[in-house]
Amino acid sequence: LKDVATVSDGFEDTDQALRFDGEPAAIIRVSRVGDQDILKITAEVNRYLETAPGGLPEGVTLTVWNDNSRLLRDRLSTLLDSARQGFLMVLILLALFLRPRLAFWVSIGVPVAFLGALYLTNYLGLSIDGISLFGFILVLGIMVDDAIVVGENVFAEQRKSRTLLEGAVLGTQKISVPVIFGVLTTICAFVPMLQGVGTSGQIGAVIATVVICCLIFSLIESQLILPAHLGHQDVKTEAGEIYLLMVPVVGILLLEFAWDVSSYIGLAVGMVSLMTLLHAFSLSQGVATRLVRSQERFSERVEVFINSHFRRLVAQAVSARYTTLAFAFAFFLSGVGVVLSGRLPFSFFPPLASDQAIAQLTMPLGTSAAVTADAVLYLEQSAEALAEELSEQFPDAPPVTHILSAVGNQPSSRGGAGPSGPGGGSSGGGHLGEVTLQLTPSQARTLDTRTIANLWRDQAGSIPGAVELKFNSSLFTVGNAIDIQLSGENVGELREIAAALRLKLSSYPGVIDITDSFRSGKQELKLSMKPEGDAAGLSLAQLAIQVRQAFYGEEAQRIQRGRDDVRVMVRYTDSERRSVGALDRMRVRTPAGSEIPFTTVAEAELGRGYASINRTDARRVVNVTADVDRSVITAEEVLSDLSGGYLNDLLNDHPRVALSLEGEQRQSGEYLVSLVFPFLIALFVIYALLAIPLHSYTQPLMIMSVIPFAYVGAIWGHQIMKQFDLVAGLAMMSILGMIAAAGVVVNSSLILTYTVNRLVSEGESLDNAVVNAAVTRCRPIILTSLTTFVGLMPLMFNTSVQAQFLVPMAVSLAFGVTFATVITLLVVPAIYRVFEDIGGLIAGPRSPAVATESSV
């Protein structure tokens, strides 16, 4: 073979290159398979890295570039901290309002329900991750509601000189119907979240599944287990009560100090032994007595306030019931006004800051890898300059730790899903490039990732000849913030409109990374036959095959070398295929076996095709996309302004072109539509569940009238938290929180209305019954609201990246329930009397006794 050809043994031609901190590099990606544990895989890799450097050639180092398990560990750590803090705050709150012994047994229901829910969620195929863990935190304050109501009622019955067991049974029976149906209505409020579509739908479904499982086991615990504890366990001394309460407190605090399961067990045994000794020798009796007396004084003052000041307030609200409703309606309008005024912008899925800032470069298709490499080098140098500036500003913790640059590929892209670490990659090409900055964890730096990306964008400026240069700082997105799809038959017309739309978008401050999906293809040679070629018996297909064999090559065979297949390619030498002129010198074989010059039988015309042809419903489409700096403007504001006239005028001038919103806007619309029908069904089921225990068709409507006020409370909650830069506005997770709040607030109203009906049936007048019911149920209703709020407080005030997208849902639920509590205690009694007034007008004059009986 050497007599007729040159044989070279080498690697396949490629345009791809990689540099890590300025040095040539290669990436090894380790991925999990099936249900493998990412934390265990990471531990194994780290153990290997501790011993691997000894066997590497000189000058070769191993560095962990993108550890996705760190994100999971940070998220789990953040949410576990929020869970511990929330549970501790709930426990303290219970101890303030209830006896320590009662607070202990109510709080014990939380881990019992969690254990049951963990078993059930595992059976349903869920795993412990950041989303499912948020579901446990979300339900933390909710699932003690039924236990609080049952426990408080049992405690009240036991104080009436009954035995512990009799008080536990009677207290549970009296309140079991509204408690059971209240939990069922709460579950119904979460069911629509199971039906959502897209990324948000998947997140909402996981959260809803966890919450529903927890509520089921919480109901079982409050109706069967809690009464058994309260009916048989009596603590004779104050020290014994405090000892019981300190068990969960110590258990939570030890979680902060234990480094593994064994250390936790050891510390727990030690602390329990110490507490037992203190209790046995009565060393803690004095402190315990003072604590119990303080709690009793606080509880007595709360009772005095409820029976005096609050009673008068409720009586006045019922007496001036139409004025009360007017104030409630004004409050409702205030929330609507906040949204309509634009002071609380809506964003479907606010971007989550990553610990990477990425610049993605796209040159015209066909650009040589050398030209792209120069542009990537420029981006890399601008990144190094920025890193140096930031290290001077923050010498103690430089924000930039590593710089990775790639030519011929964009390794962070996975179908546009955002930064995910090299290795997945988009399809390669010499016209593609990317530079990635690895940043220190968000909690360890002052500047957020978007600010660093914006500084880098300003530092780099524009790249001459670049088709697209995007700077990305988000962990993931559900689509482009602005994505306008144009469809039509005329490609030239679509390009003209796309150019005009890009120019219009550039006039908005804060709109960045504007581009469209139209891409010219590579330069190509279009072959055509001459009459001489036809006369020689050549076809265009035969000609194309010979040109491909000469310049790309023909695979002659494959040779097995170890684990690799080595392809043997036959083609012209490098010098004979470097230029277009080489084609003119090529010899073409005819069917007769002779060889004639290419220029004799064919000609080649230089031109460009399309990089890709996109069609929707058989029509050509071009997408105009852009990102927004949400600190300046939102995508909704831009699109609202465009829809106000510009887009209509554009379509009127081009009647054959259609327009649609894609990306984040389409995801938002589809998700909202997917929730509407399930939510309406859930409302109907809630109405039915309320009508069953109340034996009324109108009283469920009265109870459900508090739902809009929960939404208004959530809106004002976002407005308040926005002042502290904890939320930017409303988001899709805010909507999910509002849906969840609907079921929780209905629970409290049901218990209140059920109590009114019971008091009326026992012979009280209607006016006295509504006031006495509000006074009787005031403490448990306030306590259930406060436990929900304080259980979510650590998460609401969490500023870490891991909790960013969860905060809006927590804000909606916490503030929605809190504001609706006031409505429940003051407005629901007034609404009850208004319904009776309306019923009296419809039925006509009746005796008071008959009216009272029919109202029940």
Ranges and model annotations:
Residues 1-13, 24, 36, 40-62, ...:
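Surface-exposed amphipathic alpha-helical segments in non-transmembrane regions
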Residues 88-96, 100-156, 195, 213, ...:
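Hydrophobic transmembrane alpha-helices and their membrane-interface caps
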Residues 65, 72, 76, 151, ...:
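Helix-loop junctions and hydrophobic alpha-helical segments within the transmembrane domains
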Residues 224-229, 236, 798-855:
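Hydrophobic alpha-helical transmembrane segments of membrane transport and translocation systems
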Residues 20, 73-89, 669-683, 811:
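N-terminal membrane-entry
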Residues 175, 236-286, 294-347, 852-856:
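Signature of alpha-helical transmembrane segments and their immediate interfacial
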